Structure formats: structure tokens, C-alpha cells
Amino acid sequence: MMVDLFSSLDGMTSLWSWLTPMFLSVFMIWNKTWSMDQNNIIKYLAASNWNNSTYNLTKSLLTIMMVLIIFNNLLGMAPFTYGITTSLWVNMTLALLLWGLILLSGYIKSPKKSLAHLAPSGAPLLLLPFLILIESISIMIRPLTLTVRLVANMSAGHIILALMASVLSSNLSNTSLSLSYLIMVGYYLFEFFVCFIQAYIFTLLLSLYMNEHP
């Protein structure tokens, strides 16, 4: 039972809210048809979505990440389930892991080129320390921006849906009930669109960070 608007963001509301996404995830992983075809599907998506017929590990990783986020976003839209993409800790862990791997890989492969990104070419010598500081801060807050963007957008959608459901359930005898339901269905479809857009933005930002890799 949802006691307030923020109950949908609490993963401890019930065991069912955790079991449903976990069961569906395990089913997708162990399903024989999916297991046989997933490699070809990932290769096709990586080639078609990134405008290149060649298959490489980076594009495959980005495609898998986008599919994973979309899958969990859509699971969170199901009634009485907990969407892990609304969890600050889950998203922060994911963002820190990916950002850290990109950063660490760059410094291991070519420390000089990685450090060169901190100092814009042609910058005045007097402004160089200040520019290096700004660039360092912008790099350090990247996991935070990835996390906040995804959590805020998905959580706001769940809260608004809970608010609309609460209003509808308290006005069942209202003459404008059909209009209210129509508005809620329209917003629900909009939230499905947001699920895809947020996954795309998260992956797009990761690809931009990877482009800075030496």
C-alpha cells in the first residue's frame, strides 16, 4: 500500500517490488532464445545506432548500457514495482564505475594526452592555472550530473503519476472522470517516452566522455 507520494521511490515498501524486476531480469538472461540471439542483436544495434557498419567493444558497451537503462526504466513504470533507476545510490554507483573506468583507462594508456585535456590549447599563460582548475572540477562532477539527471527525471515522473492516481481515486464520482483518465493515460505515454530519452541522454554523455579518451 502506497502511504504517500514518495512511497513509489522506496524500494522497501514490499518484497514484491524487488522480486518482479529481479524475476524478469533473470528470465531475460536465462531464456534460451534471448541467449542465442543477444550477441547478434547487440552487434546490429551497435552498428545501426552509431552509424558504422563495423563492430567494436566500445559501441557494444554503450548499446548494452542504453538497453539496460531502458529496461529498468520501463520496469519502474509497472504498478507496485520499484524502479532502480530512481535510486540515488544505484545510479551513483553506475556513474562512478563507468566514469572511473574511462578516466583510469585514459591515464594508463597515455598520461600526457590525458593531462593535456586539462589545458586548452592557445590559452594565455596567466589564465592557465584557473582554466586547469575549472576543467578539473568539470571532470570531477560528471558522475554527479549523470546521476542527478537520471534520478530527478525518473523520480519526478513517478511522483506525478502517483499524484494523478491519488486525485483520480478520490474523485471517482466526478463527472470529469473520463477526461482525467484521458490526461493520465496521455501522461503515462509521455513517461514511456521519457524512459527512452533519459537512457539515450545517459549513453550519449558517456560516448562524449569516451571521445576524450586518448
From Swiss-Prot:
Database matches in InterPro entries: ATP_synth_F0_asu (IPR000568), ATP_synth_F0_asu_AS (IPR023011), ATP_synth_F0_asu_bact/mt (IPR045083), F0_ATP_A_sf (IPR035908)
Cellular compartments per GO CC: mitochondrial inner membrane; proton-transporting ATP synthase complex
Keywords linked to the UniProt accession: ATP synthesis, CF(0), Hydrogen ion transport, Ion transport, Membrane, Mitochondrion, Mitochondrion inner membrane, Transmembrane, Transmembrane helix, Transport
An annotated Gene Ontology molecular function: proton-transporting ATP synthase activity, rotational mechanism
Stored Pfam families: ATP-synt_A
Protein name according to UniProt: ATP synthase subunit a
Function field: Mitochondrial membrane ATP synthase (F(1)F(0) ATP synthase or Complex V) produces ATP from ADP in the presence of a proton gradient across the membrane which is generated by electron transport complexes of the respiratory chain. F-type ATPases consist of two structural domains, F(1) - containing the extramembraneous catalytic core and F(0) - containing the membrane proton channel, linked together by a central stalk and a peripheral stalk. During catalysis, ATP synthesis in the catalytic domain of F(1) is coupled via a rotary mechanism of the central stalk subunits to proton translocation.
The keyword Electron transport belongs to this UniProt entry's keyword annotation: no
Lineage: Eukaryota, Metazoa, Spiralia, Lophotrochozoa, Mollusca
Broad class of where this protein is predominantly found: mitochondrion
Record membrane topology: Multi-pass membrane protein
Subunit record text: F-type ATPases have 2 components, CF(1) - the catalytic core - and CF(0) - the membrane proton channel. CF(1) has five subunits: alpha(3), beta(3), gamma(1), delta(1), epsilon(1). CF(0) has three main subunits: a, b and c.
Listed transmembrane segments: 9-29, 64-84, 88-108, 121-141, 150-170, 182-202
Classification via Gene3D superfamilies: ATP synthase, F0 complex, subunit A (1.20.120.220)
